């Protein structure tokens, strides 16, 4: 009973507390932004519609996050390590959300900043897609019929990622999606912060157009609520999560999701660049 309490209830309770703390910080940030006499003040209210839209946008990367977190939990067992993973992933997701709001509010007239962030995030996502396909190819008895096209796709990704290796090394020197390493408590917090933060940056492409038609406060709450619900599910059923994220079908779908989001990010970067030339 004690093991169950420490292994599941404590991390899940901490997930809820972290959500409430980050929501309070979000509210405070929006108050500060409103104090700057913006041309269009931010409405500090929300409706269910905005919250649901935010959750939907977040869950677009749910497969990606589940793969990352499931492998991280598998490589770092124990309730203390789960606490570190929760803190890192929640703060990473929260800060990514805050950054989207701040950049949109203060720097929407400086599109070059958005181009750089979207481009870097897209490069990282292609590297993560390659690692998913590498893990799939290691499972030699699964989905034999599609191993050849998957191998060809993995080779193409390897070629592209080789070109971008300096960028990958500079921003995420130890990024590895499917072979997470055992880390200390402090290092685990830092590492588990990185991927949710990077995935959040790539969502600039989807977030920014929405901010002109929806309430950003409700949208941001929805993003963080989606993260909280997904994290609780992962903590409540860790063994199932590990089996699921190692399944060949999930690896393929996750890789395709990474590629799709990454290519969309490149497309959005090009569109923004062409609009300012």
What are these regions (language model features)?
Residues 1-277:
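Multi-pass alpha-helical transmembrane bundle typical of ion/small-solute transporters
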């Amino acid at each position: 009973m004690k093991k169950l309490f420490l292994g599941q209830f404590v991390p899940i309770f901490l997930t809820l507390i972290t959500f409430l703390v980050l929501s309070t910080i979000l509210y405070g940030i929006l108050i500060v932004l409103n104090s700057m006499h913006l041309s269009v003040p931010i409405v500090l209210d929300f409706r269910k519609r905005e919250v649901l839209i935010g959750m939907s946008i977040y869950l677009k990367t749910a497969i990606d996050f589940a793969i990352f977190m499931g492998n991280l939990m598998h490589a770092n067992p124990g309730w203390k390590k789960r606490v570190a993973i929760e803190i890192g992933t929640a703060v990473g997701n929260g800060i990514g959300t805050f950054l989207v709001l701040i950049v949109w509010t203060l720097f929407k007239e400086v599109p070059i900043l958005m181009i750089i962030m979207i481009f870097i995030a897209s490069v990282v996502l292609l590297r993560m897609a390659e690692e998913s396909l590498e893990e799939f190819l290691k499972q030699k008895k699964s989905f034999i019929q599609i191993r050849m096209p998957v191998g060809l796709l993995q080779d193409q990704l390897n070629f592209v990622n080789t070109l971008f290796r300096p960028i990958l090394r500079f921003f995420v020197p130890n990024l590895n999606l499917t072979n997470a390493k055992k880390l200390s408590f402090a290092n685990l917090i830092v590492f588990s912060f990185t991927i949710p933060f990077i995935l959040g940056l790539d969502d600039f492409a989807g977030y920014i157009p929405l901010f002109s038609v929806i309430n950003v406060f409700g949208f941001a709450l929805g993003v963080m609520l989606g993260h909280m619900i997904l994290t609780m599910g992962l903590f409540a059923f860790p063994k199932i999560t590990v089996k699921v994220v190692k399944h060949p079908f999930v690896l393929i779908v996750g890789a395709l999701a990474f590629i799709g989001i990454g290519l969309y990010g490149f497309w959005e970067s090009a569109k923004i660049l062409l609009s300012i030339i």
